[in-house]
Amino acid sequence: MVNPYNQDLDANSANYQPLTPLSFLERAADVFPEFTAIVHGNLRRSYAEFYLRSKKLASALSQQGMTRGSTISTLLLNTPPMLEAHYGIPMCGGVIHAINTRLDAATIAFQLDHADSQFLLYDRELSAIVKEVLSQCKVKPQLIEFIDKEHSYESLDNFDLDVIDYEEFLDRGDSNYQWLMPENEWDAISVGYTSGTTGDPKGVVSHHRGAYLLAQGNAMVASMPKHSVYLWTLPMFHCNGWCFPWTMSAIIGTHVCLRQVRAEPIWNSIKNHKVSHLCGAPIVMSVILSQDQKNRFNITHEVQFFTAAAPPPENILREMQESGFLVTHLYGLTETYGPAVINEWHQEWNSLDMNAQASLKARQGVRYLPLEHLKVLDPDTMKQVPADGKTIGEVMFQGNIVMKGYLKNKSANQKAFEGGWFHSGDLAVMHPDGYLQLKDRSKDIIISGGENISSIEIEEVFLKNDCVSAAAVIAIPDQKWGEVPCAFIELKKDQNWNEIHAKQWCEENLASFKVPKYYFFENIPRTSTGKIQKFVLREKGKSLTGTN
């Protein structure tokens, strides 16, 4: 039987347009052109200005040959150009590649080469690392330099490279530029790189549809009314700021930019701009609470703080609550555009004591609104594990906020999507109430201050030293950072290498946030087949460091 609802009812331009979050900014500029979109120091930009500058960026890039499928990279802090890049780059059909500003030169060079980057927008503060990167990468992207007038630089000396000033580049753009809608909502909008747990980092490709849906989902899940005020304590290079650069245009909200996460400007922003929402790793909460009591003030409006990574300690949660913040725990990956799981709080839980509340808040939670399916499965049988809070399985996802795939990596895609599910590599239990809780990371990722650190990468650095015969790196709980790397090192015979040498070696070969905090020199436990027993080291590390 022919389905009558499929006869002569084809999609056409009148009833179907590809979903894209770029449309949020166009609407905001049409409906609320004079409303303040961006606050940065003394700078204020309206939605009309925000939209115009984004179009001019798109036009200027288009004039230089950037079009559908072109990669444009950014090495920017949480400043207005980073927001403009999230619109202007895809408006010319390009794909935004937001680079973690804390990475070392070799890793950034790899990403630029792998993504075939053609432009690099960077902040003057990062010019030294840019120069080092360009000496190591094969591609030669055109450099666009942003000099922040709201910031005092130590030096404004130019290095001998072909650089265009960001504002001058925007001036080349046409204010009447007709920006490009995606031909298909499955078209790529961004590429972001994983931390490289098993070799080189993988390029995670996200599409317009997923970004649109997660951006709207953020607004609903975070209960963000129209004209909410969002403070940028979360780096925008992390999963495109969890799609909040697009969310805020959907609700005609105000972005409050922040170059550095420090206590005083955070408290001042909350007071002066009536910030309603902010996000970040537990370390950001520690920064907020580091402000002297005498320099704080009583928060008279609701401020929601969304945190991911390692569960925050009980005392941090208590003090945040006492200080006037409503804290919600999220979980997600680069491969899911950021948050895909939320710890939905039940009102009756407020009557529990703080210990019980902290235990509940340590759970990752339930599926995010735009996610279709979230399960904990046995990866061998692909069957659900019992929801008993004890049986461990792998967290798997299905839905429109799962990545398009890994760039130029067919084998990794086949493995990641095996069985019709996205395999996260994270191990968890499912509680009887349907809330999942992470128990381990099969990829041995260490989450420190919201940054993903590969234990394998650190181990490989140790093994490059002639004194070292073996190394194993684990995560150790840390009050400030959530987790920190801890290294166990076996030395070759008759080698005299100590903690000072090891730390110096790491500082010379790793980004600063990847350098281990603890070093122990001893025999590393192994299985009968020679595999390192990291579960033994985790318990030993906690004992040796006095953590739990």
List where the protein language model places each region.
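Conserved AMP-binding A3 loop
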Residues: 46-49, 189-213
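Conserved AMP-binding/adenylate-forming
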Residues: 271, 303-305, 312-330, 334-435, ...
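Conserved AMP-binding/adenylate-forming core of the ANL superfamily
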Residues: 16, 26, 34-79, 83-87, ...
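Conserved AMP-binding/adenylation subdomain of ANL enzymes
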Residues: 212-229, 237-277, 290-293
